[in-house]
């Protein structure tokens, strides 16, 4: 078969995917794609695409992310794909394979109610299984990560996509090891980039907003308030270090998926406004 007919998704005689703006340079297309999908992903932070965490849900996410780049955004590929020597699902089996994987995910209640170690373990498994299907001609990793980022949020966790983007080579290596049956590298990365939602809220939201979202954070803020009050009684040069250490201890506890114990009466008294 002539090369120009081997892949209908690329411009004849090139490896550049056909795209809406008509870019013919691969590097420029990568930059354009990254910029456009980053903007579209930002829209999903406050307005996520709802769905049943199945293929239709994944297709809707892919369409949203890549709508400015490819005409076929959100559509199942019609050509075979492989990465290195590992083939992905053939087009004829993408629908059935995805139904089976979505059913497996639903049987586990979409990973709700798990502590962080177990959540990381099961997410690594399901991500790798979905990634092996690779339903789209391009953009599978980004769409699948957004898909599981929404699933994580639904289960009470946050997946920090920016940290994955900033270590793309490491992530790609871990994904390749996962396709070969070794999930340890991807579990190690997920353990670093996944945090309980309440821990993220404690770090970045105003206290009133954080408490509205997660009332169980009351003990964490009381602990911090007590530490700040106590710090007023120690030498100035030691205050910041003491408060930072307390905040780090609270953050570590929350990152483990646990709640801070309520401060003692004495500690709470120290934290009252003077």
For the regions a protein language model found, what residue spans apply to each?
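FIC/Doc superfamily catalytic core
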Residues: 1-274
């Amino acid at each position: 078969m002539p090369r120009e007919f081997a892949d209908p998704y690329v411009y004849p005689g090139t490896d550049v995917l056909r795209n809406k703006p008509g870019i013919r340079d691969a590097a420029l297309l990568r930059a354009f794609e990254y910029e456009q999908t980053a903007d579209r992903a930002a829209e999903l932070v406050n307005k996520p695409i709802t769905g049943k965490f199945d293929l239709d849900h994944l297709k809707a996410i892919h369409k949203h992310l890549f709508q400015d780049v490819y005409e076929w955004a959100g559509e199942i590929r019609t050509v075979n794909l492989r990465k290195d020597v590992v083939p992905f699902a053939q087009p004829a089996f993408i629908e059935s394979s995805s139904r089976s994987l979505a059913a497996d995910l639903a049987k586990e209640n979409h990973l709700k109610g798990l502590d962080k170690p177990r959540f990381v373990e099961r997410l690594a498994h399901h991500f790798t299984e979905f990634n092996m299907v690779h339903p789209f001609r391009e953009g599978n990793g980004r769409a699948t990560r957004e898909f599981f980022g929404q699933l994580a949020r639904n289960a009470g966790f946050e997946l920090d996509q920016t940290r994955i983007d900033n270590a793309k080579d490491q992530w790609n290596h871990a994904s390749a090891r996962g396709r070969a049956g070794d999930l340890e590298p991807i579990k190690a990365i997920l353990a670093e980039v996944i945090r309980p939602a309440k821990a993220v809220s404690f770090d970045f939201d105003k206290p009133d907003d954080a408490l509205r979202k997660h009332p169980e954070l009351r003990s964490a803020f009381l602990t911090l308030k007590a530490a700040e009050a106590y710090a007023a009684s120690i030498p100035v040069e030691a205050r910041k270090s003491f408060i930072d250490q307390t905040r780090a201890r609270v953050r570590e506890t929350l990152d483990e998926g646990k709640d801070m114990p309520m401060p003692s009466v004495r500690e709470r008294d120290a934290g009252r406004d003077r």
